[in-house]
Amino acid sequence: IMGHMVNSLAQIDEFVGLGSNSIETDVSFDKQANPEYTYHGIPCDCGRSCGHSTKFNDFLKGLRKATTPGDSKYHEKLILVVFDLKTGSLYDNQAYDAGTKLAKNLLQHYWNNGNNGGRAYIILSIPKLNHYKLITGFKETLKNEGHGDLLEKVGHGFSGNDDISEVQKTYNKAGVTGHVWQSDGITNCLLRGLSRVKAAVANRDSGSGIINKVYYWTVDKRSTTRDSLDAKVDGIMTNYPDITVEILNEDAYKKKFRIATYEDNPWETFKE
């Protein structure tokens, strides 16, 4: 259950309190490709305030506390964070630098330079396929800093609703062979069918595709929640985690689905 648009530290507590075991956070960049704020801006989902904003490194420090066992702010249930990287403001040739700078920020402020940092799994979600060098920059930086082991905690997604075969080709270019979460969706203000979600699920289940997990966004209605579960998604991104919890407790779903814990491997495709 992925809490949507969690861009302030107070919202971490709020969304986990409502039932989220995962959050999605928007990351804006400055002109030099430095991650700057956790901020979505206008327009955003209907019924939500678009203006929550935190300095990126301050958010990382708070997130670290929320995902470090023993800390007073620790939430055992919070195990996955999707960074929705707003790289649309950057030139294509800045993608590598953005990845480098993102890695350095996470290493210092979230992973505490490898010394008992936050334990959550991280997904780097990129809107444009031609920004795939962000992945390269991120990976090479962690390796160069002597912390390549942390890549075990990092997964990937492209959020642009591109053709699945194009996504697959882009991962090949980026040297990505696993840890792939494929999203599909649209703002809650509009309706979208499930055909692309079903194509992503088929790729996931084919055994020959690159996708490990599929999630759908932004799912706020009970009917859409049921439709998503019927399509066999792995994750639901929502503004109302308590509604997702309610549906998961219905007889039709409570035997088939459960909320993931830290012991579950987010990079392993679930086999029925």
From Swiss-Prot:
Disulfide bonds join C44-C50, C46-C189. SUPFAM superfamilies: PLC-like phosphodiesterases. Its cofactor is Mg(2+). Pfam families: GDPD_2 (PF13653). GO terms for molecular function: lyase activity; metal ion binding; phosphoric diester hydrolase activity; toxin activity. Keywords: Cytolysis, Dermonecrotic toxin, Disulfide bond, Hemolysis, Lipid degradation, Lipid metabolism, Lyase, Magnesium, Metal-binding, Secreted, Toxin. The active site is at H4, H40. InterPro entries: PLC-like_Pdiesterase_TIM-brl. Binds 1 Mg(2+) ion per subunit. Expressed by the venom gland. GO terms for cellular component: extracellular region. Mg(2+) binds at E24, D26, D84. It is found in: Secreted. Its EC number is 4.6.1.-. It catalyses: an N-(acyl)-sphingosylphosphocholine = an N-(acyl)-sphingosyl-1,3-cyclic phosphate + choline; an N-(acyl)-sphingosylphosphoethanolamine = an N-(acyl)-sphingosyl-1,3-cyclic phosphate + ethanolamine; a 1-acyl-sn-glycero-3-phosphocholine = a 1-acyl-sn-glycero-2,3-cyclic phosphate + choline; a 1-acyl-sn-glycero-3-phosphoethanolamine = a 1-acyl-sn-glycero-2,3-cyclic phosphate + ethanolamine. GO terms for biological process: killing of cells of another organism; lipid catabolic process. It comes from the Eukaryota. Its main location: secreted. Belongs to the arthropod phospholipase D family. Class II subfamily. Dermonecrotic toxins cleave the phosphodiester linkage between the phosphate and headgroup of certain phospholipids (sphingolipid and lysolipid substrates), forming an alcohol (often choline) and a cyclic phosphate. This toxin acts on sphingomyelin (SM). It may also act on ceramide phosphoethanolamine (CPE), lysophosphatidylcholine (LPC) and lysophosphatidylethanolamine (LPE), but not on lysophosphatidylserine (LPS), and lysophosphatidylglycerol (LPG). It acts by transphosphatidylation, releasing exclusively cyclic phosphate products as second products. This is Dermonecrotic toxin LvSicTox-alphaIC1aiii. The lineage of its organism: Eukaryota, Metazoa, Ecdysozoa, Arthropoda, Chelicerata.
